[in-house]
Amino acid sequence: MSMPFRVLGIETSCDETAAAVVEPAADGRGGRIMAEALLSQVEEHRPYGGVVPEIAARSHLDHVDSLVIRALGEAGLTVHDIDAVAATGGPGLIGGVIVGVMTAKAIAQVAGKPFIAVNHLEGHALTVRMTAGIDFPYLLLLASGGHCQLLAVEGVGRAKRLGTTIDDAAGEAFDKVAKMLGLGYPGGPAVERAARRGDPRRFRLPRPLLDRPGCDLSFSGLKTAVRQTVEKLPPGPLSEGDIADLCASFQAAVADCLADRCRVAAGIFSARHGRGRPLVVAGGVAANASLRAALTEVARQADMTFVAPPLALCTDNAAMIAWVGVERLRLGLVDTMDFKPRPRWPLDPDAPKAAGAGGVKA
């Protein structure tokens, strides 16, 4: 198989339908996005305040073919010019995952190309290998709407979980607080915008598990504290100032929690792998500027290098799926047509279940 490997990636795990073509850089470090096409379903789900799985699956089915055609066209390629087809195989909303996997399998069969099922979480985890060309191992905080984990990423398909949320993910807490305050969907960007105008010291909110041993996280109690704070305010609609101060106080609490857990994880990671390795932040929550600033300081104090994907690649996208396809294709790791989509697919299948983590999606 000739270099460079050009891989078509398809992402349909939640509320973005996307296709992209990626190839490795000429020097073998990092990669290049040849083309990408993405359709967000935000407006379709906004009236419901969150993602409706049936609507998401139908939208993926309606649009995935045209996005694949667009991505290939922008790359100047046909399906016969690519070296493999990769698709998110899980975890995610199973209806959408099925759409992407079946589309990728059909293209692979027609073109006679390998099919690669990608763990959506590994897509986030390896994005910085495409954008920054960093080497293994590195410490990863993966924080999104459905997942919040600290992992030692040691290779393709090799990650050791150091900590995880025992209840809500950080992004889920952002979404629920936004809904509580009437800020709409998606909640993360709305809370961040409101927080810029607010006073993070006005409301004293808890920092769950702060200074406790281990690297596990918790956000359910913080979310509840915001609701209780709202209930103590004078009756009637919240003022813009109240909303801004609540958002700023909540965001500061999340930043403190993530920073504290990352400090603990950095100590564990550095003891195993040596100092000076990267601290990587990925997932939708990594787009939050306040959280990036807090974690940049953690990296500095721990003698680590802070690395995060470009903002456009923090949220779900197909380029990260195609890139994992490149990484796996290099190693000869391809899948058969018998692969079954997985609603759950942990990055570290050997990690014990966190105490109280009954609702954790990964």
UniProtKB/Swiss-Prot annotation:
Annotated localization: Cytoplasm
Cofactor(s) this protein cannot do without: Fe(2+)
One GO CC term on file: cytoplasm
Top EC class of this enzyme: transferase
UniProt entry tagged with the keyword Transferase: yes
Biased composition (Basic and acidic residues): 342-351
Residues that, per the record, bind substrate: L142, A143, S144, G145, G146, D175, G188, N288
Region of interest (Disordered), residue spans: 342-362
Annotated binding of Fe cation, by residue: H120, H124, D316
Entry's family note: Belongs to the KAE1 / TsaD family.
Full protein name: tRNA N6-adenosine threonylcarbamoyltransferase
Provenance organism: Rhodospirillum rubrum (strain ATCC 11170 / ATH 1.1.1 / DSM 467 / LMG 4362 / NCIMB 8255 / S1)
Gene: tsaD
